[in-house]
Each structure stands twice: as structure tokens, then as C-alpha cells.
Amino acid sequence: MEAEDEYSAGCSFSLMCQEDSTDLDDDGGGGGCFAGDGRADLLLVYNAAAAADDEDEEEVEEYMDHLVSKESSFCSSSSSTSSSSCCFSDAGGESAAAAAPMDWFALARRATVKWILETRGCFGFCHRTAYLAIAYFDRFCLRRCIDRSVMPWAARLLAVACVSLAAKMEEYRAPALSEFRAGVGDDGYEFSCVCIRRMELLVLSTLDWRMAAVTPFDYLPCLSSRLRRHVGGGGGAGASAALIFSAAEAASVLDHRPSTVAAAAVLAATHGALTREALESKMSGLSPSFLLDKEDVFACYSAMLSQPTSPASKSTTTTTGKRSSSSSCSESTDAASSYDATAASFPAAASCGSKRMRLELPGGILR
């Protein structure tokens, strides 16, 4: 047991680059966004947006052009396949694409995304870490076949590996693999350190080791600042984050570009429900050189507002579609805490299951 514990403790760092911690620990050892309740990254969004007001316009343009260029390069190779063509098979080996609609996969994916968000709250990860983990999961599912018969636990194992890899990419201190517990009640699973590490390597090889993707959270500071300067508003980073994750829970994050998701989230969080004409008018103030597909933004925006968990869909709007300032402030606060509230129940669910299954990755399950 002691040997296994020592091995488990070292596994979380086996895939990490050796970096100089002096470049990372700018907060005097506070642990960055790893510590606390996970809202430090939202504070950074507010601070960055405020600082952007005083920055040279050309620098902001250059930064956003860089993001768009990186995003375009990444999307062209990572999401050339539609999410509707995911490769899954049922217990009898029949292709799910030729069978009935994959409601079972939609349910499994939704449960996986919820678990990733709960885990983010439990460990205090920044929002970008959670979004990257979801993106890894969706990209993996485009390239690998998963048997339906093993989907519940195979999807959870994949989620653990994706969260672990995302944490190693983004967090100052990544948890040891032994710290990840994917249990839910008495039906939970406890994966060995070796099993998680194997899945990590499978994810890395499947994604061609391209892990540093652009996310909607990279755009939020600039978009929020621009929206505030040109058309008013632009705050509500918490509401924007909740909208982004609400959309990620409902459909693959590969369905829309990160810039599209960020623009839709900022507009929905700031203005609530708008007509198409009003939305396009607000979009014109985001950036003259920021090439946004209006059709795509409107589709993503509408999808966000249609989700029952969306904070913007619950808002009370005036006839012109604008929320009152008091309503906006209240909902922004609620949205900022909606995805952190599950952290209180997650540790209990992860530790109370007395009936655990210790699973190793069998051959032939993922191919």
C-alpha cells in the first residue's frame, strides 16, 4: 500500500514540464486560481477589462488578431468533423450513426460535463481549466470509438483524464492522480493511478499533443471592455461564465468557435434577450477588425438564452430587451456562484460510497 501511495503521488507530475516556479507564483505563494472558491479568474477578467480601457487600441487589436489567428489554425485541424459524426458503437457493435438518435450519448455527455464543473468547484480550478477539459473530451470523442456498454464508467475515466491534463496545463498546482474521485453515491468508480495515466497518454496521442487551445475566456476581457466603451454595459463576468458553461453542457464546444461563444455570452449577460437587429447593432461595437460571423453568433446567442439553466433566460427584460441594472447585478451574482455551489456536495459524494469498483482500462474498449 505504501509503495502504491508513493507511486500515485508521483504520477500527477509524470507528464508535466519542469518550470521555474518563480515565474508562476506572482501572488506570493497564494496558489493563484487554484486556491479559494474558484472566482479568482473572474476577478482577473474584471481587472483585465478595466486595464484594457487605458491600453493602446492597437495593442488590443493585435492581441485579438493573435487569438483569432491561433483559433482559426486550431479549429481547422481539430474540428473539421461535425460533432454529429462522433464515432460510437452500441453493445452489439452496430454503428450509432446508423441507429436511432444517440440520446444515450447526450445524457452521458451532459453528466460528464456536470462532473467536470463539480470537480472544478471542488478543487478551485479556474474556469479556463474546466472549459479545456470539456474541449478535450469532445475532441477525443470525435476520433475514438466507445462501446455503449461501457459508456458510463469509460466516459467518467475519460473525464478524469481530461480534467487532470487541463489542470496540468493551467493550474499552478495540479492534484495528484490519487486525489481524483469520480464517485456519485453508491454507483461511483475509483480509478487507479495507473489507469488514469494510461488514459492521459491515450488522450494526448489522440489529440496529437495539441492541448493549448484558445477558449472563450481568453476573449472576455477585451470584449467586455469594448462593449462597455461603445454601447454601454460589458460587465457581468460571472454571468458570462455561467452562460458559457450552460452552452457547453447542452452541446459540443466544437459547434462554435471560442470567439463566437465569448461574444454571444458577453452580449447575453449584458443585455439579455434582444431582437436580431438589436443584437447585430451591439455586435458592431465589439471590434471593427474582429471578424465575427453574425449568423453563428446569433445561433449561439439564441441557444444560450434557450437553456433552462441560463441566467439570461431567467432575467426580466423591458420591451426593448434591456434588463434593469438591479436585476442585472443580482443575476450576475447568482450566475457567478451557480457553478461553485456544487462544490459543497461533491466531496461528500466522492467519499461516502462504500461500494467502489477498482477498474483498469481493458483492451478493445477504446479504439
Swiss-Prot record:
The keyword Cell cycle applies. One of its GO terms (molecular function) is cyclin-dependent protein serine/threonine kinase regulator activity. InterPro entries: Cyclin, Cyclin-like_dom, Cyclin-like_sf, Cyclin_N. GO terms for cellular component: cyclin-dependent protein kinase holoenzyme complex; cytoplasm; nucleus. Residues 307-333 are annotated as: Disordered. It holds the Pfam family Cyclin_N. Keywords: Cell cycle, Cell division, Cyclin. One of its GO terms (biological process) is cell division. SMART domains: CYCLIN. Belongs to the cyclin family. Cyclin D subfamily. This is Cyclin-D5-1. The gene is CYCD5-1.
